[in-house]
């Protein structure tokens, strides 16, 4: 089995993370987890209080245990809160262990007047590696806002990354961005939004994946597999996910297909170990 750390991570996530010690013995970097504290006096925007699985404190001591049990040596946090101060909250939360928590993909609203100010301030910390597009203010007219393109250009100029969540965005959106900003490093979240049903992958989805993957700066995370399953509880057998994973492997290859779990959301479908076993099973013969 090839190590679940690929060359793109060195350039995308580790550049600027001066505290990270390169070590050939590190087998796995999880590029997609969330940390939050539901007991904070100010509360938090996500997860909702009625989520019986996720609404509880999810802090470093909880992921430390999971990562130690499963051989995860380093991780990148993806900020799930839309509150700007929560970016710094996470950076402060993990500053005691910079070798394990090596980066943060932040949450800032693209196309807003203060985007550059907030990005500049947060980027003074080398662990702040980029942002994620999650919500889509303005709906279909979002990309008609030139301020959006100015902010995306700023990310590209800074050599920072753009994570794209497929719930309100599409692979066609990714393709459009790459055509206008070919040097922007993009990481598509959650197996490119695949609808996984345990049967041959949707031909339209395959074509969209292949189109988006033509740009060498577009990468894809094998994250959220359990969440993309139409069958619940999520199957734990690799064969159920094989078709979509094969498509992604053919499109992105070993250099641009990146491991991420989406923990603790993975717990809706199974344990971390069960999730990792599916991914390791896929890479076993690669």
Predicted segment positions?
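Mid-to-C-terminal alpha-helical segments outside catalytic/metal-binding sites
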Residues: 2-4, 19-21, 26-31, 56-74, ...
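C-terminal motif of bacterial Sec signal peptides marking the signal peptidase cleavage site
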Residues: 15-16
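An N-terminally biased module of ancient metal coordination in phosphate/nucleic-acid-related enzymes
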Residues: 20-89, 94
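Short amphipathic alpha-helices and their capping/turn segments at secondary-structure boundaries
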Residues: 21-28, 116-124, 172-181, 203-214, ...
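Short, well-ordered coil/turn segments that N-cap beta-strands
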Residues: 24-27, 71-76, 98-103, 125-129, ...
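Active-site metal-binding loops of divalent metal-dependent hydrolases
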Residues: 33, 80, 191, 262-263
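Active-site gating/metal-coordination segments in enzymes
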Residues: 84-169, 176-179, 221-227, 233-235
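H/E-rich (His + Asp/Glu) clusters that bind or coordinate divalent metals
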Residues: 195-286
